[in-house]
């Protein structure tokens, strides 16, 4: 029996797909090379932007034709499955199972049922659409392991959901309120990942800074304390060398967290801190609950405490009511802070959010033009920052051979820059760390020589 994943959206979706893959492998399934020939197609969906949903709808249309030609099962999961639970199966009858965000604990049984149905056309299905919907909601299920086989990197979900309710964001409505994973479960996963040869982990949550989980003795552990505990667990084998985390909310970027990042050698000196906009007026309408002054204060504290820190952010343009002065404020902020990189996008109205009913929507062509200015500026800043790193000696996690030249190796730096090691480096470096000098920059990829 074969499976194939199509995963859309955020890193949490990728982690959840990896955790489901672990279950399938343990049950004897094998990974198919493509979606066209699998027995089970699992589509893990995203609802953050309408473009992500449209891509899924397009793929469902494609697979509708394929399903008329051969037998296979389609399982829809993720945020879109939660948001459009009933409607989407009515529109696309090819979907055999829709599993919402809070029914994921049923997946092991559903996988067994699909295997039985593949073997026997007369098998009576238990987990019909109505039955799944009527099952008691268990709350969010944290899988014990989210590691993709043979990978030197792994995501580790530590919390799910969001309590912030930014007016443009659908996430709290599809993922629910914040739930923190128990400390001991997280540390057990760290131990298992170390035994599997994982060298780098990324802690995940919609707002990791607000983590508040209990340890084995019932004590409440906040995010800085959790990071310290994870670092001490990693010390035991020295296998996991780099620890990352995302996403963070500026209101929760505490001095204690900044000091912990500075103090712990395993914590990567890279912080992703979404600002979303440079105008206080727009931030207030977004319900971001901080001001630009507060944000700049946090950035100043980060730079003063960790001089070599790299900073990335999210920027959302074209929010309802946005003026040219608001756009200028955003461009000014970018020039002042000089983010190393940014994820930039324009506003998509999401039905069910507060901003969906806001007046003064910005015309599509204006949103695109404003976003273009932001992207152009960030590209210049990123190029400047990357050129300044030429000649520096850095550590690189070597992941694989280079796609273009097998005699070269590919990896990334502590601050996430893609790097090719040239000069016939030994293949034994794959899965290990190499110390190298950044010699050239081609596009957004460094070329480096071993020291």
Swiss-Prot record:
Its EC number is 2.8.4.3. One of its GO terms (molecular function) is 4 iron, 4 sulfur cluster binding. It is found in: Cytoplasm. Its main location: cytoplasm. Binds 2 [4Fe-4S] clusters. One cluster is coordinated with 3 cysteines and an exchangeable S-adenosyl-L-methionine. [4Fe-4S] cluster 1 binds at residues 10, 46, 79. Its cofactor is [4Fe-4S] cluster. It comes from the Bacteria. Keywords: 4Fe-4S, Cytoplasm, Iron, Iron-sulfur, Metal-binding, S-adenosyl-L-methionine, Transferase, tRNA processing. InterPro entries: Elp3/MiaA/NifB-like_rSAM (IPR006638), Methylthiotransferase (IPR005839), Methylthiotransferase_CS (IPR020612), Methylthiotransferase_N (IPR013848), Methylthiotransferase_N_sf (IPR038135), MiaB_methiolase (IPR006463), rSAM (IPR007197), rSAM_horseshoe (IPR023404). One of its GO terms (cellular component) is cytosol. Residues 1-116 form the MTTase N-terminal domain. [4Fe-4S] cluster 2 binds at residues 162, 166, 169. The keyword Metal-binding applies. CDD domains: Radical_SAM. The keyword Zinc does not apply. Residues 387-451 form the TRAM domain. SMART domains: Elp3. Residues 148-384 form the Radical SAM core domain. It catalyses: N(6)-dimethylallyladenosine(37) in tRNA + (sulfur carrier)-SH + AH2 + 2 S-adenosyl-L-methionine = 2-methylsulfanyl-N(6)-dimethylallyladenosine(37) in tRNA + (sulfur carrier)-H + 5'-deoxyadenosine + L-methionine + A + S-adenosyl-L-homocysteine + 2 H(+). Belongs to the methylthiotransferase family. MiaB subfamily. Monomer. Catalyzes the methylthiolation of N6-(dimethylallyl)adenosine (i(6)A), leading to the formation of 2-methylthio-N6-(dimethylallyl)adenosine (ms(2)i(6)A) at position 37 in tRNAs that read codons beginning with uridine. This is tRNA-2-methylthio-N(6)-dimethylallyladenosine synthase.
């Amino acid at each position: 029996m074969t499976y194939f994943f199509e995963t859309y959206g955020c890193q949490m979706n990728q982690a959840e797909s990896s955790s489901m893959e672990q279950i399938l492998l343990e049950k004897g399934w094998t990974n198919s090379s493509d979606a066209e020939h699998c027995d089970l197609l699992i589509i893990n969906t995203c609802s953050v932007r309408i473009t992500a949903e449209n891509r899924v709808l397009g793929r469902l249309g494609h697979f509708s034709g394929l399903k008329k030609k051969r037998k296979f099962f389609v399982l829809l999961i993720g945020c879109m499955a939660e948001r459009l639970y009933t409607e989407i199966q009515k529109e696309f009858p090819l979907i055999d199972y829709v599993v919402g965000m809070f029914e994921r604990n049923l997946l092991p049984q559903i996988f067994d049922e699909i295997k039985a149905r593949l073997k026997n056309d007369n098998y009576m299905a238990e987990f019909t659409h109505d039955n799944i919907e009527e099952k008691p909601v268990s709350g969010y299920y944290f899988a014990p392991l989210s590691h993709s086989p043979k990978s030197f990197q792994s995501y580790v979900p530590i919390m799910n959901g969001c309590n912030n309710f930014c007016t443009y964001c659908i996430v709290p409505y599809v993922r629910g309120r914040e739930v923190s994973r128990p400390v001991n479960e997280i540390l057990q996963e760290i131990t298992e990942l170390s035994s599997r040869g994982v060298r780098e982990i990324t802690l995940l949550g919609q707002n990791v800074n607000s983590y508040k989980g209990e340890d084995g003795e019932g004590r409440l552990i906040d995010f800085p304390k959790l990071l310290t505990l994870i670092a001490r667990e990693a010390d035991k084998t020295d296998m996991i060398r780099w620890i990352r985390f995302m996403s963070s909310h500026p209101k929760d970027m505490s001095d204690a967290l900044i000091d912990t990042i500075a103090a712990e050698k395993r914590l990567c000196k890279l912080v992703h801190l979404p600002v979303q906009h440079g105008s206080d007026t727009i931030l207030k309408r977004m319900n971001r609950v901080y001001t630009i002054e507060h944000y700049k204060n946090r950035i100043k504290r980060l730079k003063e405490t960790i001089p070599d820190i790299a900073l990335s952010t999210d920027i959302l343009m074209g929010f309802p009511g946005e003026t040219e002065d608001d756009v200028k404020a955003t461009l000014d902020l970018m020039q002042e802070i000089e983010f190393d990189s940014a994820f930039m996008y324009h506003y998509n109205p999401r039905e069910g959010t507060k901003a969906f009913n806001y007046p003064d929507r910005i015309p599509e062509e204006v949103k695109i033009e404003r976003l273009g200015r932001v992207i152009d500026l960030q590209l210049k800043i990123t190029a400047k920052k990357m050129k300044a790193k030429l000649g520096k000696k850095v550590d690189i996690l070597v992941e694989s051979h280079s796609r273009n030249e097998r005699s070269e190796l590919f990896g990334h730096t502590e601050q996430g820059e893609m790097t090719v090691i040239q000069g016939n480096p030994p293949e034994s470096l794959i899965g290990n760390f190499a110390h190298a000098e950044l010699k050239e920059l081609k596009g957004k990829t460094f070329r480096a020589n071993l020291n």
